[in-house]
C-alpha cells in the first residue's frame, strides 16, 4: 500500500526552484513516488477540445494567434451552433474521450444568445455522460452560477505565466483579474482548470513563481494544464525557439510534486514532441492529454497515434472524474 502524500499550500519559491534544479533522474524518482500514490493503476484521462468561437479576440496575449491585435492568419469566425458542437462531442466520446472542452476566443462572457447557447452546450455534453469544460475569459458571479446549474464540470482560466513576467505577455487583463475569475468559479462550485505556458522568454524563477501561485490555491486546482509555447507566425513571440522537451518534463514533474491530487494535463506543444518525450512527460506525472485532431488553433496528434502512445507507455485511458478522483 502506497503511503499518502502530504498536500501543502505553503511551498516557497526557493523550494520550488530547488526542485526544478534537481538532477533529472532524482526529480523523476520523486515525482514518480507522488504520482503512483495519487494515481494507482496509472490512468490517463482523455480530453477533447473544440474551438466554438475562433479568432477576433480583444485580448493581446502575445502567444495567441486568435488575438485581433496580431497579424496571424487566424481570422474571426462566427460561433458554432449548438447541434454541431454536440455532434463533435458525441464523436469525441466514441473515440474514447470522457471530457469535452469548449473554447471561446472572448475577453469575457457577455449575457445574451451566445451565452444561452453555451449553457445548452454544457447541458448537452453532460447528458452524453461526459465532463464539460469551458474556457471563455472572465465572467460574473451570476454567469458562473448559471454555468454550474447547467452542469459545468470545470472552467479553464490559466495564469499563463508568473506575476513578474505577466505584463510582458498580456496588457489587456491583469494578473489579479485572473485570480478573481478563479475565485468566482470556485464560489459557484465549479472545479478549476488552471495552469500556464513555458517557453515565452521567462526565467526558471518565473516558472517557480507561477507554480507557487498555483500551489497556494486552496484546494489546489483540480486540473493543471502545462503548455509549451507553440510559436505562431504573426504573433509577437513568433521567433522564439521551441523549448527543450526536458524542460517540459521537469515542469510536469514539479507540478506533480506540488499538487499531488490535481490532474496534470500535457497540453499545447505536445504535437512538437517525439513519442519518447511524451512518454517521459507521462512518467513525470502527466495524467491527462488532449486527445484527437484539434487543439484550438494548433495541431494535435491524431487519435490512432494517441492510442498507440498510451499502449507503448503501458498506461490505461480514463479513470475517474475530477470530483471522484478528489474523493478517492
From Swiss-Prot:
GO molecular function, one term: 4 iron, 4 sulfur cluster binding
Pfam families in the cross-refs: BATS, Radical_SAM
The record's free-text note on cofactor binding: Binds 1 [4Fe-4S] cluster. The cluster is coordinated with 3 cysteines and an exchangeable S-adenosyl-L-methionine. Binds 1 [2Fe-2S] cluster. The cluster is coordinated with 3 cysteines and 1 arginine.
Cofactor(s) the protein requires to work: [4Fe-4S] cluster; [2Fe-2S] cluster
Keyword annotations of the record: 2Fe-2S, 4Fe-4S, Biotin biosynthesis, Iron, Iron-sulfur, Metal-binding, S-adenosyl-L-methionine, Transferase
All copies of domain Radical SAM core, residue ranges: 42-267
Pathway participation: Cofactor biosynthesis; biotin biosynthesis; biotin from 7,8-diaminononanoate: step 2/2
Enzyme class: transferase
SMART domains: BATS (SM00876), Elp3 (SM00729)
GO biological process, one term: biotin biosynthetic process
Quaternary structure annotation from Swiss-Prot or TrEMBL: Homodimer.
Function: Catalyzes the conversion of dethiobiotin (DTB) to biotin by the insertion of a sulfur atom into dethiobiotin via a radical-based mechanism.
HAMAP family, per the entry: BioB (MF_01694)
Full protein name: Biotin synthase
Organism: Synechococcus sp. (strain CC9311)
Gene: bioB
